[in-house]
Structure formats: structure tokens, C-alpha cells
Amino acid sequence: AVGKFDIQLSFMERCKPYLENKEEAEKAYQLTLAYYHFFQDNYHKTLAILNDIYPRYITGGLAYTLRANTLQICCYLALTVREKHYDSDHFENAAESFRKFISREGILSAEKKKPFQNFLTMCNAIFKFHFKELMDKSRKEPGKVRLLAKLEKFYRITSKPWLKKMIRE
């Protein structure tokens, strides 16, 4: 994935000056840069970019807001799972805030909310698995199998390949 994003990053750097809407060009570039670092497992750098460029929950540029916040939640979950002393409150607060945001009337239709709601459901299940079931090592593999089965039941879900990766770790 990293090589693919090297090409995308190079493309964005070359094309950014030619985009008419400079604000949109900057958002697109920064989001590309965030994804570039995310797929290199550099979650702290990804979060720094996202926190700099995207104010929380703006309705103008909704597609960018949804992608940025989904990516932010992925980073917080990965850091919570991978770094022993990382504060899990970051994940829990971001997930709850995003749930409230997408649930607000007029932000998204019910059909468009569903993949994000399913994403949050799975993120919370992965979070709980890593902090409850992993205390008993004998439950690790059966727990992963259950989580993967639960994930496969979702027809519409955001970030499914990444969620699979998190479960398999």
C-alpha cells in the first residue's frame, strides 16, 4: 500500500497548484498526506495532520469531514491497542463524538449513516475485545474468529479491510 500512496502523494504535489479551489486543494492534499502516514502505521503523524487541518465536525466539505474523522478513530483505536500506555479515552471520546455527529438530523440520510454506524460498532467491539478478552490468552483466537464473523455479517461498513487487519493482530 505504501508504494501506491507514494504515487498518489507525488500526483497530489504536482497537481495541487492547478486546482481552482485552493481551500479544497489543501484539504485534499492534507487528507492524502494523512492516509500516506496512516498506511505506514505512523498514527501519531496522521493524527497531527488531521488535527491541524480539520476542525471538528464541519458540515461544509462533509466528505472530507467523514473521511478525516473515520481515519482519526482508526488511529486512536490502533494506538490504544498497540501502545500499552496510550490513553484509551482518546478513542472512546472520538468514537462517541462521531456517533453523535452522524446521528444528528440532516447531516446524513439513514442509508448513508449505516456504514459509519456499523464501523463504530465494530471499532467498539475490537476495543472491548482487546481490553477484556485478551486478559485470558486462551480466549484470544476464538474471540478473533467471533469478531471476524461479526464483521462479515455487515453488508455496508466503512474501512472493512482495515478492521480485518486490526482483528487479526
Model-derived segments and spans:
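C-terminal non-catalytic interaction modules
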Residues: D89-E169
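TPR-repeat structural position
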Residues: F5-D6, Y43-H44, R82, S88-F91
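Short coil/turn linking the two alpha-helices of tandem helical-hairpin repeats
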Residues: V2, K22-E24, F39-D41, G61, ...
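"A position-specific structural signal for the A-helix of alpha-solenoid helical repeats
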Residues: A25-F39, N69-L71, C75-A78, T121-M122, ...
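Extended, well-ordered alpha-helical segments in internal regulatory regions
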Residues: Q72-E83, F127-L134
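Helix-turn-helix repeat elements of alpha-solenoid scaffolds
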Residues: A1-M12, Q40-N51
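Residues that mark the junctions of alpha-helical repeat units in TPR/alpha-solenoid scaffolds
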Residues: E26, T65-R67, P115
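Solenoid-like repeat scaffolds
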Residues: E13-E24, N51-A63, S97-I107
